[in-house]
Curated annotation (Swiss-Prot):
It comes from the Bacteria. It is found in: Cell inner membrane. F-type ATPases have 2 components, F(1) - the catalytic core - and F(0) - the membrane proton channel. F(1) has five subunits: alpha(3), beta(3), gamma(1), delta(1), epsilon(1). F(0) has three main subunits: a(1), b(2) and c(10-14). The alpha and beta chains form an alternating ring which encloses part of the gamma chain. F(1) is attached to F(0) by a central stalk formed by the gamma and epsilon chains, while a peripheral stalk is formed by the delta and b chains. GO terms for molecular function: proton-transporting ATP synthase activity, rotational mechanism. PANTHER family: ATP SYNTHASE DELTA CHAIN (PTHR11910). This is ATP synthase subunit delta. Belongs to the ATPase delta chain family. Its main location: membrane. It is a peripheral membrane protein. Keywords: ATP synthesis, Cell inner membrane, Cell membrane, CF(1), Hydrogen ion transport, Ion transport, Membrane, Transport. GO terms for cellular component: plasma membrane; proton-transporting ATP synthase complex. InterPro entries: ATP_synth_OSCP/delta_N_sf, ATPase_OSCP/d_CS, ATPase_OSCP/dsu.
Length: 177
C-alpha cells in the first residue's frame, strides 16, 4: 500500500460525499482517474517534486487536465496543491473507488491464474465469493505464469491461495520445520 493512503482518505471522502450529494459519482471517478494519470506523467512528476508555489502548481496542473476537470474538480486540485498533496491523487482515486464500492455493496475481487479462465469458471468464482462476502463482486482477472496452476483470490484483506505455487511453498515450510 502506498504511503499516501492516510493522507488520501479525507480527500477521497470529501470528494465522494460531494459526488453523492450532486449525483455525479461516475463523473468524479472519471475526473480523479484522469488527474491520477496526470500525476504519473514524467514531466508532471518533476513539477510536483519541485519548488513551485502552490497556486502556480495548481494552475499548471489544471491547465494540463483541461476540460477533464469541472469547476469542483479544479477546486479539489487547488486545495490539494495548497496542502502539497497532489502526489496523493492515485491513492485518492483508490480510496474513492473503495467508498463507491462500499456504498454500492460491491467488492473488488482480484483473481490471479496461470491461464485465462473460462466464463463458467469465472461465474463459479463470482458466485462463491458473492456468497462468502454477502455482496456483489466485480472480478478483476490477472494472468501470472508463476502461479503454475490453480488460482489466487484476493478480496480486501482476505487471500485464498489455491495455486500450485502456494501449495509448494506451504509444503517447503512444513519440510523445513
Amino acid at each position: 500500500m502506498s504511503e499516501f493512503v492516510t493522507v488520501a482518505r479525507p480527500y477521497a471522502k470529501a470528494a465522494f460525499d460531494f459526488a453523492v450529494e450532486h449525483q455525479s459519482v461516475e463523473r468524479w471517478q472519471d475526473m480523479l482517474a484522469f488527474a491520477a494519470e496526470v500525476t504519473k506523467n514524467e514531466q508532471m512528476a518533476e513539477l510536483l517534486s519541485g519548488a513551485l508555489a502552490p497556486e502556480t502548481l495548481a494552475e499548471s496542473f489544471i491547465a494540463v487536465c483541461g476540460e477533464q476537470l469541472d469547476e469542483n474538480g479544479q477546486n479539489l486540485i487547488r486545495v490539494m496543491a495548497e496542502n502539497n498533496r497532489l502526489n496523493a491523487l492515485p491513492d485518492v482515486l483508490e480510496q474513492f473507488i473503495h467508498l463507491r464500492a462500499a456504498s454500492e455493496s460491491t467488492s473488488e475481487v482480484e483473481v490471479t491464474s496461470a491461464t485465462a479462465l473460462s466464463e463458467e469458471q469465472l461465474a463459479k468464482i463470482s458466485a462463491a465469493m458473492e456468497k462468502r462476502l454477502s455482496r456483489k463482486v466485480k472480478l478483476n482477472c490477472k494472468i501470472d505464469k508463476s502461479v503454475m496452476a490453480g488460482v489466487i483470490i484476493r478480496a480486501g484483506d482476505m487471500v485464498i491461495d489455491g495455486s500450485v505455487r502456494g501449495r509448494l511453498e506451504r509444503l517447503a515450510d512444513v519440510l523445513q520445520s
